[in-house]
């Protein structure tokens, strides 16, 4: 016996989306031009102090890697920290549809993948596709030091939290 599908990749993505929805656990979705993996590691490290946390292994962050990560989730897991990498328009929408994050983190808007995305404005547009599937009571965390991310003021009533990383922080005592 077998199940015939038009696209095995689409079937894997659809099953991962369904599986994650059944588990009903919070998801932190992380994207950005650089720093995704380091940010994922830091967030997962903090969360695992209190919650049973599953994180993306390595950088299994594409349209096959994300579903494979989701399939590692078990009933006892309490939160998922999922890295999402893209190189073209529409990819983030497809990844976010699977993950449906409660919290979106965007590390920065750089110059990676300009061959498909055109310029940094294109990168911003592609990365912020993650918001389309953000949970209604969700959170957006942005790098406040990134000039492009500072332009994101809100998404459907959700105002982003912008984190600043400056060397002046120690001088504010």
Where are the regions that the model predicts?
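Conserved beta-strand termini and adjacent loop/short-helix elements that scaffold enzyme active sites
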Residues: 5, 56, 143, 163-164
């Amino acid at each position: 016996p077998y199940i015939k599908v038009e696209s095995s990749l689409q079937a894997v993505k659809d099953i991962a989306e369904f599986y994650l929805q059944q588990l009903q656990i919070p998801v932190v979705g992380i994207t950005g031009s650089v720093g995704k993996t380091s940010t994922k590691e830091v967030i997962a490290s903090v969360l695992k102090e209190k919650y049973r946390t599953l994180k993306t292994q390595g950088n299994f962050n594409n349209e096959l890697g994300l579903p494979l990560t989701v399939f590692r989730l078990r009933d006892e897991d309490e939160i998922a920290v999922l890295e999402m990498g893209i190189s073209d328009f529409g990819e983030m929408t497809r990844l976010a549809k699977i993950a449906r994050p409660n919290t979106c983190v965007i590390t920065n808007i750089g110059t990676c993948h300009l061959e498909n995305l055109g310029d940094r404005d294109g990168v911003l547009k592609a990365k912020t596709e993650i918001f389309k599937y953000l949970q209604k009571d969700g959170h957006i965390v942005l790098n406040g030091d990134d000039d492009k991310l500072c332009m994101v003021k809100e998404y459907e009533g959700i105002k982003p939290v912008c984190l600043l990383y400056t060397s002046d922080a120690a001088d504010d005592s």
